[in-house]
């Protein structure tokens, strides 16, 4: 079956954005979908505006999709968009590492098929969605003044403003350095603590002004927008994004059927490092080095499909600038029985 990416795709329905590497994602999942036949269920763990799911549902006429998003507004919008596919799509309002328990407890036919046959494939397009960036009042974008919220699920957890107004100098500097790779993390943390004594942070414009004043002009000329790294770090901390990635990998790989594939799209080095490390561990035999064959029970149950981290082509980047930083890794299950469980647990 050939999947060349041709589809009557309406960019306006995807908030002005085309899903990153949609044709390549279909190619990576195609062998698993074809092997599963009528029982093929795909988990779109980062549903967003529904662009990847729409593409898969159109490209693979028999596939069913479980779409997961912690943002109820995104889930509602995507569900309306995918309503022409009727019962081939079901949405779940949850953080993506909760998909195992959602499948275990779900009542529709899609969940029943998944429980009986396992998941044929899964896609995780990590980071903030285009839809969330377009919602100015969410505070994800630094180019427009908005409340410093940044929660992907507006019902839960602390906001970016809470972090700025309550974290110690050490904790604030740590997240800026670790999650944003910010060279001036300590200097920025000092400025934040000094300014919040005058008035608590509430909106993004004040933080952006502080960053312009704190980061040296020479760096601003060569290092991109001075707010980019700080906003990324705050978003990752607010949403516990790296924790969710670490927890979902065992959840989704345990749920795969034999021949099933999990694909992760990362946009920053910390995300990709987590995926790479986990995939390497899952695909490595535990037989002691030097033995001529695997000992019983030590053979790897998974195999890495991609050679290193795949990158987008120049043609893809020209069509979709967001693809410039993407790194793609895929894993296939070789043996084992599918199971469904909560993060950090086993059934």
UniProtKB/Swiss-Prot annotation:
Query: Which GO molecular function entries does the Swiss-Prot or TrEMBL record give?
Result: rRNA (cytosine-N4-)-methyltransferase activity
Q: Name one GO biological process term.
A: rRNA base methylation
Reactions performed catalytically: cytidine(1402) in 16S rRNA + S-adenosyl-L-methionine = N(4)-methylcytidine(1402) in 16S rRNA + S-adenosyl-L-homocysteine + H(+)
Q: Give the enzyme's EC designation.
A: 2.1.1.199
Q: Kindly list the cysteine pairs connected by disulfide bridges.
A: none
Enzyme class of the recorded protein, top EC level: transferase
Compartment(s) where it occurs, according to its Swiss-Prot or TrEMBL record:
Cytoplasm
| Residues given in the record as S-adenosyl-L-methionine binding sites | 50-52, 69, 96, 125, 132
GO CC list: cytoplasm
Q: Which SUPFAM superfamilies match?
A: Putative methyltransferase TM0872, insert domain, S-adenosyl-L-methionine-dependent methyltransferases
Where does the sequence pass through the membrane? none
Q: Return the similarity comment.
A: Belongs to the methyltransferase superfamily. RsmH family.
**What protein am I looking at?**
Ribosomal RNA small subunit methyltransferase H
> Which species is this record about?
Corynebacterium aurimucosum (strain ATCC 700975 / DSM 44827 / CIP 107346 / CN-1)
